[in-house]
C-alpha cells in the first residue's frame, strides 16, 4: 500500500469522525459509505480502526453514534438491572423502560463459553424501540437473551435515579425484573 493510499484512508476516517460528530442522529454504514464513495465494508473497517484508537463511537441498531464527553455526562444516573423474559416480551420490556425517560444502553449475558457478551442497544424512545424490534425481526437475528433462557442484564441511563426507579417498578409489576 502506498503512502498516498494510507493518507487517503486517514483522511476518510477523519471525515467519518466529523460526520458522526455533526450528526444529530445515528448514521448507518450504508449512509457513510455513500457519502465517502466507498463500500460499507470499508466503513466497518474504518470504524473498527477508530474504535481501536479509543474514539468513542458506538454501533447501535440505528447506526453509528459518536459519544462525546458532554453526551456521556448528560445522562448522570446509571444502573445495571437483571431481567428475565422470553423474546416475545422484549418490546414490552424496552417500552416500559423508555416510557419513564430512561435509555437502555446495552444488553449483557453471561455465556458459558465466551463469558460476558455485551451488545449496544441505545434506545431511549418508543420510536427507537420500534426500529430496534423491526431490525431484529427483519434480519431474523436472535436476541442475546435467548442464549441464556431469557436471563440478561441491561445498563440503564437517565438524568436522575428517580426515573430509573420508576422504570424498575414498572418492570417489576410486569414480572420482568429479577430482584435479589
UniProtKB/Swiss-Prot annotation:
Keyword Ligase applies: no
The keyword Repressor is annotated on this UniProt entry: yes
Gene Ontology terms, MF aspect: DNA binding; small molecule binding
Null mutant phenotype: No visible phenotype when grown in the absence of nicotinic acid.
Keywords (A to Z) from UniProt: DNA-binding, Repressor, Transcription, Transcription regulation
Family matches, as SUPFAM superfamilies: Putative transcriptional regulator TM1602, C-terminal domain (SSF75500), Winged helix' DNA-binding domain (SSF46785)
InterPro entries in alphabetical order: 3H_dom_sf, 3H_domain, HTH_11, NadR, WH-like_DNA-bd_sf, WH_DNA-bd_sf
Lineage: superkingdom: Bacteria
Short name of any one Pfam family annotated for the protein: HTH_11
Functional description taken from the UniProt entry: In the presence of nicotinic acid represses transcription of the nadBCA and nifS-nadR operons. Also binds to DNA upstream of the niaP gene, probably regulating it as well. May bind nicotinic acid.
Quaternary assembly: Homodimer.
PANTHER family: TRANSCRIPTION REPRESSOR NIAR-RELATED
Name of the featured protein: Transcription repressor NadR
Organism: Bacillus subtilis (strain 168)
Gene: nadR
Amino acid at each position: 500500500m502506498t503512502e498516498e493510499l494510507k493518507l487517503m484512508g486517514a483522511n476518510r476516517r477523519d471525515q467519518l469522525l466529523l460526520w458522526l460528530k455533526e450528526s444529530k442522529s445515528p448514521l448507518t454504514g450504508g449512509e457513510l459509505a455513500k457519502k465517502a464513495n466507498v463500500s460499507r465494508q470499508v466503513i466497518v473497517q474504518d470504524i473498527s480502526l477508530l474504535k481501536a484508537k479509543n474514539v468513542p463511537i458506538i454501533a447501535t441498531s440505528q447506526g453509528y453514534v459518536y459519544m462525546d464527553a458532554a453526551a456521556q455526562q448528560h445522562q448522570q444516573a446509571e444502573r445495571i438491572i437483571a431481567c428475565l423474559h422470553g423474546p416475545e416480551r422484549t418490546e414490552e420490556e424496552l417500552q416500559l423502560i423508555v416510557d419513564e425517560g430512561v435509555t437502555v444502553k446495552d444488553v449483557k449475558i453471561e455465556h458459558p463459553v465466551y463469558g460476558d457478551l455485551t451488545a449496544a442497544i441505545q434506545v431511549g424512545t418508543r420510536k427507537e424501540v420500534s426500529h430496534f424490534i423491526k431490525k431484529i425481526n427483519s434480519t431474523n437475528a436472535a436476541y442475546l437473551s435467548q442464549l441464556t433462557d431469557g436471563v440478561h442484564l441491561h445498563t440503564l441511563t437517565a438524568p436522575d435515579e428517580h426515573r430509573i426507579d420508576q422504570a424498575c417498578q414498572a418492570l417489576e409489576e410486569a414480572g420482568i425484573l429479577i430482584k435479589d
